[in-house]
Amino acid sequence: MIISHSRKFVFLKNRKVGGTSMEFFLSKYCSGEDVVTPIGEEAKFLPQSLQAEFGREIRFQNYRSFFNHYSGVKARDMLGHDLWAQYYTLTFERNPVSKVRSLFYFNTADVSEEGDPVADFLDTTYPGYLSDAFRYISNDGMIVDLVGNYDRLNEGFETICRRLDISFHGEIGFQAKGWQSAGRKEFTIGPTLRQEIADAFALEAEFVPWMAIEGTRPICSASRLAR
């Protein structure tokens, strides 16, 4: 997470959207008064194009009481509602099906093909685990100015950089990781699992229309409370 007082923006970091690389890019434009939370073990998952720079330019500072994947509601309460309203608040999301598939390939990167890795994954992981709604939706509705689309990353960052008066040269320096390698088990998502994912991400789809899963209609209430 980043709270930049110098450029007046807040970046909330969701999961499985390349958030570490986004955080790295934005942190380079932060000053000494800004909050930049540590990313810990996530540093080893930075794309190779950024690993050489990591640790030399990014500064983890002023982060006491803040955490990397922090709830937007808690961050707003700590920052103050007045400043939150003044700052440009942003985060990124991705299609829920793509998000679950990404987690499967990430978690099973070193798993043997023996047995059924897909079944094992679904036995231990439920779709709602990846819901990040509580980071940018509160009981009062959406609390951020922008939920960028991971699949339109460069377009989103062009808008962000223009708003923050940051130089942008067409990309932020990384591309989505390809966890699936030749010969690995394919993660097939059938109608039943698609519906389960749609139910788990019903709240997100209510506020971020492009997160709705085509061909499904969530049967659970989308009014669950944000944490």
Protein language model features and the residues they cover:
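Membrane-interface amphipathic segments in extracytoplasmic regions
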Residues: 1-227
